[in-house]
């Protein structure tokens, strides 16, 4: 039996030509950085340098920064990605040329109605949505929303106290994941849930399903390797996000809006109500108002952007405080002095908490919420002698920047004093980017910080945290997607008092 098929010469020629064309398709973009004299790891056909991510984004970025310096080139499949760490170039990308050249983030494939979400929308549509949503995130609006968040800190303390009384190691992700989910569903959808104690709640189940995202998911990989498939998937109504989940949230928002329009009494002030109000505000005189579908898209993206990041950031803070008891004690002293007798925090009180601010900032330096920032170059451009071709993804490796010893002496050390008022002027704003910078920074930054600080205030009023034998020291990070611990972060929770106010 012949192992080699008995094809005609024409068939063999066609097969060879097809294979050559396929190879050229999978490699033709891989010479861009070499031509420009930009160093970087060697790409593989079709895959580019994507296999290096198996070791984890963050360590890979640190490795490249150390090996190649301020500039290096990667390939996510066929997509050229230029990593930059020079603060002047970063400023140009995020601020100076944001509107003209670096407006948009990368398109990661078919996302359905979430194309209308502020984090994903592009160009003029993004500008319109940003203008309509910006009044929602002012300090005045957040102050009005503060009581909603504060009520969930009581639930947080109760859940934390249960772990303390049982004397077992407590999973920070379980506790803060529930808190984060409860706050986001309350503020984005107007729905009150107790996700830790009611895991079967439909909202809880749908949110958890929404957040099951893997960078090595077949659909994600297929559009990364073959981006021309994205329009086909969109035409077939295929999305990266489960359709039943999006339909559930869409129905929920529509029902909630209808109920609120019928009710005459004053509505509670949450993101959903503020977006509904924006449909009739003066802002829409200069911008087309948010549609109902756009409101759904923003509500869903708030969950996607806020749940994992907030719960992980809070877990990181308490891990660092547990292994640095002197810093934990100093922060508790500040909290006790600000509001004795375990009184609830107020919005204005949190603004005056200098050491709390320092601790949160230093935690976000070590574990930035956005481990990478990205912008797509819309036209050929040269910045500080670096030529960037149209279509290149410009990537800022925040995690690596925050560990650069040139800007951060002993970068692996946890030192809140780096962010004291005395030292603030020494910090380059383009080397500290936990929420990005410029016109397209994280619109929810103030909300995220408020959410984190009020939670920390309440738990540190009532508890102290200690490492236990199950605590992973030093902490290892997950190799999958978002910046989070590799294993569940377990700590011993010790009650500071026999009575817990408000819980």
UniProtKB/Swiss-Prot annotation:
Keyword hit for Glycosyltransferase: no
Main localization (coarse): endoplasmic reticulum
Keyword annotations of the record: Endoplasmic reticulum, Heme, Iron, Membrane, Metal-binding, Microsome, Monooxygenase, Olfaction, Oxidoreductase, Sensory transduction
Cofactor(s) recorded in Swiss-Prot or TrEMBL: heme
Gene Ontology CC entries for this record: endoplasmic reticulum membrane
Cysteines paired by S-S bonds: none
Membrane topology: Peripheral membrane protein
Residues the record lists as binding heme: 442
Tissue spec. comment: Mainly expressed in olfactory epithelium.
Record InterPro entries: Cyt_P450, Cyt_P450_CS, Cyt_P450_E_CYP3A, Cyt_P450_E_grp-II, Cyt_P450_sf, Cytochrome_P450_3A
Class of the enzyme per the UniProt entry, highest EC level: oxidoreductase
Subcellular location field: Endoplasmic reticulum membrane; Microsome membrane
Entries under PANTHER family matching the protein: CYTOCHROME P450 3A5 (PTHR24302:SF38), CYTOCHROME P450 FAMILY 3 (PTHR24302)
Stated name of the protein: Cytochrome P450 3A9
Organism field: Rattus norvegicus
Gene: Cyp3a9
């Amino acid at each position: 039996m012949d192992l080699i098929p008995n094809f005609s010469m024409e068939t063999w020629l066609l097969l060879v030509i097809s294979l050559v064309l396929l190879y050229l398709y999978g490699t033709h973009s891989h010479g861009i950085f070499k031509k420009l004299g930009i160093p970087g790891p060697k790409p593989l056909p079709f895959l580019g340098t994507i296999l290096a991510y198996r070791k984890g984004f963050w360590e890979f970025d640190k490795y490249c920064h150390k090996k190649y310096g301020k500039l290096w080139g990667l390939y996510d499949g066929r997509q050229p990605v230029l990593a930059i760490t020079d603060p002047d170039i970063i400023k140009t990308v995020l601020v100076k040329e944001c509107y003209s050249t670096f407006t948009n983030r990368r398109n990661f494939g078919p996302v359905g109605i979430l194309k209308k979400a502020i984090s994903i929308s592009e160009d003029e549509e993004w500008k319109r949505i940003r203008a309509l949503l910006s009044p929602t995130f002012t300090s005045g609006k957040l102050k009005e929303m503060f009581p909603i968040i504060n009520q969930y800190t009581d639930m947080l303390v109760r859940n934390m106290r249960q772990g303390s009384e049982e004397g077992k190691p407590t999973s920070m992700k379980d506790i803060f994941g529930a808190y984060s989910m409860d706050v986001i569903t309350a503020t984005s959808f107007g729905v009150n849930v107790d996700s830790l104690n009611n895991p079967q709640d439909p909202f809880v189940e749908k949110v958890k399903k929404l957040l099951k995202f893997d960078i090595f998911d077949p659909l994600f990989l297929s559009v990364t390797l073959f981006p021309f498939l994205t329009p086909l998937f969109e035409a077939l109504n295929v999305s990266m996000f489960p359709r039943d989940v999006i339909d559930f949230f869409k129905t929920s928002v529509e029902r909630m809006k209808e109920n609120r329009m019928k009710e005459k009494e004053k509505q509670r002030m949450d993101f959903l109500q503020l977006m509904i109000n924006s449909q009739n505000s003066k802002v829409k005189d200069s911008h087309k108002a948010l549609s109902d579908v756009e409101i759904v898209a923003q509500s869903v993206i708030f969950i996607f952007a806020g749940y994992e990041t907030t719960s992980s950031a809070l877990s990181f803070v308490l891990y660092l405080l547990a292994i640095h008891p002197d810093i934990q004690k100093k922060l508790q002293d500040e909290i006790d002095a600000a509001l004795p007798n375990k009184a609830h925090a107020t919005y204005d009180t949190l603004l005056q908490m200098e050491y709390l601010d320092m601790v949160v900032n230093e935690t976000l330096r070590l574990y930035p919420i956005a481990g990478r920032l990205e912008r797509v170059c819309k036209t050929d451009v040269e910045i500080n002698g670096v030529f960037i071709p149209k279509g290149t993804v410009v990537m800022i490796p925040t995690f690596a920047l925050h560990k650069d010893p040139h800007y951060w002496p002993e970068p692996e050390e946890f030192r809140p004093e780096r962010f004291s008022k005395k030292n603030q002027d020494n910090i380059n704003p383009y080397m500290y980017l936990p929420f990005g910078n410029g016109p397209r920074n994280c619109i929810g930054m103030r909300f995220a910080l408020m959410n984190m600080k009020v939670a920390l205030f309440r738990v540190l009023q009532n508890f102290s945290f200690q490492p236990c034998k199950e605590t992973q020291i030093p902490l290892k990070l997950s190799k999958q997607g978002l910046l989070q611990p590799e294993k569940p972060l377990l700590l011993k929770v010790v009650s500071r008092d026999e009575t817990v106010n408000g819980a």
